[in-house]
Amino acid sequence: MQAPLGSPDWLGVFTAAERPDLWHLARDEKVFNGLWPEYNMHGNHTASYFGSLFPEHANLQVLLVDTRTDRLVARGRTIALRWDGTMQDLPPGIDAAGLRAVNEPGQATALSALAAEVDSAYQGQHLSCLVVKAMGDVARAAGLAPLLAPVRPSWKDRYPLIPIEQYASWQDDSGFPFDPWMRVHARLGARIVSVAPRSLQISAPASDWEAWTKMTFPGDGQYVFPGGLAPMTMSRGVGTYFEPNVWMLHEL
């Protein structure tokens, strides 16, 4: 792949089909795992669709490399799915999008982002923006435009009690989204098309939640926890959390 406009001279951009060695490196050495809260690694459905990305859809996975050292510095994971372009047909979240893609192979008409990850040593260099640009390039090359993005708002954990509908409407002084990650997408031309209050589901025993959050959950109820974008509900020893996202659309 050609590096997007605005890339530093040292940046190389590849698909996982072009550099399967780096895809395996990221998986085997868990290069990006520390970027996510532990609870986020245990979605009810995520393994089924994240597990389908390679090798079946290696040409849709983006890898950013520091060519001076051949170091993998960022990754963009995407999935192809059927979408007719209407809001009625828009999946209600990332889980639904991923499961639709897995359950309806060969019917894809659009590309959905799943995750954009940047090595902590390379953050602050606008690489997340370049990952999104590269996702758009992949979508065009595969004939899968537009690019959908179920955006996980990066500051939502600061406001876990604010409904995602309200949070998504907040703007900064320049009229762009208040949330930094949403703002990255907006500055690249994306627009908000919907919110997904129950985008990703995580249900697990209280003991797991206690290990993930370093908290104690003495009884039933709703709990705010570190890194959570919304409260988690504990009932009869099982904690259920629905992570909210914001659907943003890159028309390309």
Question: What is each stretch, according to the model?
Answer:
Residues M1-D89:
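Short amphipathic alpha-helix that is part of the acyltransferase structural core
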Residues N59, F242-W247:
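Short hydrophobic/aromatic beta-strand or adjacent loop that forms the aromatic wall/cage
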Residues G76-A115, Q123, P153-F178, A196-V238:
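Conserved acyl-donor/pantetheine-binding loop and adjacent beta-alpha core of acyl/acetyltransferases
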Residues Q123-A141, P146-A149:
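Conserved acetyl-CoA-binding loop-helix of GNAT-fold acetyltransferases
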Residues L148-V151, V193-V195:
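Short, conserved beta-strand edge motifs with alternating hydrophobic and charged residues
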Residues M182:
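ATP phosphate-binding glycine-rich loop and adjacent ATP-lid/helix-beta elements
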Residues A186-S194:
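Conserved acetyl-CoA-binding loop of GNAT-fold acetyltransferases
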Residues L249-L252:
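Short beta-strand-to-coil "C-cap" segments at the C-terminal boundary of structured domains/repeats
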